[in-house]
């Protein structure tokens, strides 16, 4: 589970990140990133629609992504929204981890 200070909860934050942030996509998810002010910390939010699957599948995908994001809590001030796509439902955690790392490297938020 992500620490409470790193969880995005407000609808306005999700909307702001999705509309104004940098966007990177692959077949498993769409990543929206807004770089924040230094010292603001990292906020992470997840959206998993019904297109991904039933409630059990959606929660499994969300839990996997949340667990993967724990490794990236050292990212400097940013707002990150991960929107899961249907292909993420049948994908292993290791594949999702690799895909997410590639997107963070492309955005300059993680080292190779």
Predicted regions and their residues:
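Positively charged, solvent-exposed patches that mediate nucleic-acid binding
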Residues: 1-112
